[in-house]
């Protein structure tokens, strides 16, 4: 049996990696957190695009709940279509890396593609293949989130400047109006 409820049990490393990859992508895109974490090692370390580090399947579940599924999620929708750039297989363990081609819609309606880079380490523990570590990152100096933040900052700066300008105009108008009319200051 290549796949059980407990995870991927295919003895051939390359076939097992392909099966595990398919399970992870499908469960992620379908928001099936139970299935996703069932493919993680009990000691898994996951580093997300925002720099947050999760330890163990429960840490991943907690992150998912807070960011995606909870009462006030940051992310409304997401999808990923990862492409492996390369992979090194060393018998019972392997390292893969590539591009996630990940797309997001935030709760405020902002949509963007990150094209996060990833590195994943998987290993066979007994008969079952599990993810040992996963790291996703984005270019800190050039990514769509920076543009969203800059746009929001510019919008709010403009609104605040307009309010201050209106208040200053009203105050200055009253002061100058009093001077012209000869009213005491």
Please tell me what each predicted stretch does.
Residues 33-90:
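A solvent-exposed, acidic/Ser-Thr-rich amphipathic alpha-helical stretch
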Residues 2-6, 115-146:
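Short beta-strand edge/turn micro-motifs at domain boundaries
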Residues 64, 82-87, 100-102, 116-123:
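Hydrophobic/aromatic beta-strand elements that line small-molecule binding cavities or substrate pockets
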Residues 86-94, 110, 122-130:
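A short, structured loop/turn motif at beta-sheet edges
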Residues 42-45, 98-105:
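Generic short beta-strand segments
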Residues 70-74, 102-113:
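Short, cysteine-centered beta-strand-loop-beta hairpins and adjacent loop/turn segments enriched
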Residues 1-38, 150-165, 169-174, 178-185:
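Short, low-complexity N-terminal intrinsically disordered segments enriched in polar/charged residues
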Residues 40, 50, 99-100, 135-138:
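A mature extracytoplasmic/lumenal domain signature
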């Amino acid at each position: 049996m290549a796949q059980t409820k407990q995870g991927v049990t295919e003895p051939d490393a390359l076939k097992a990696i392909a099966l595990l990859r398919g399970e992870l992508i499908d469960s992620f895109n379908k928001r099936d957190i139970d299935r996703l974490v069932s493919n993680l090692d009990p000691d898994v370390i996951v580093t997300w695009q925002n720099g947050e580090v999760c330890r163990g399947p429960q840490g991943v579940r907690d992150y998912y709940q807070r960011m995606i599924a909870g009462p006030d999620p940051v992310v409304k929708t997401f999808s990923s279509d990862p492409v492996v750039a390369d992979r090194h297989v060393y018998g019972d363990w392997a390292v893969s890396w590539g591009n996630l081609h990940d797309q997001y819609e935030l709760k405020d309606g902002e949509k963007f593609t990150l094209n996060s880079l990833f590195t994943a380490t998987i290993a066979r523990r007994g008969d079952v293949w599990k993810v040992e570590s996963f790291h996703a990152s984005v270019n800190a100096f050039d990514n769509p989130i920076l543009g969203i933040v800059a746009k929001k900052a510019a919008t709010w700066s403009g609104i605040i400047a307009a309010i201050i300008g209106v208040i200053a105009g009203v105050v200055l108008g009253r002061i100058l109006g009093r001077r012209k009319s000869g009213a005491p200051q």
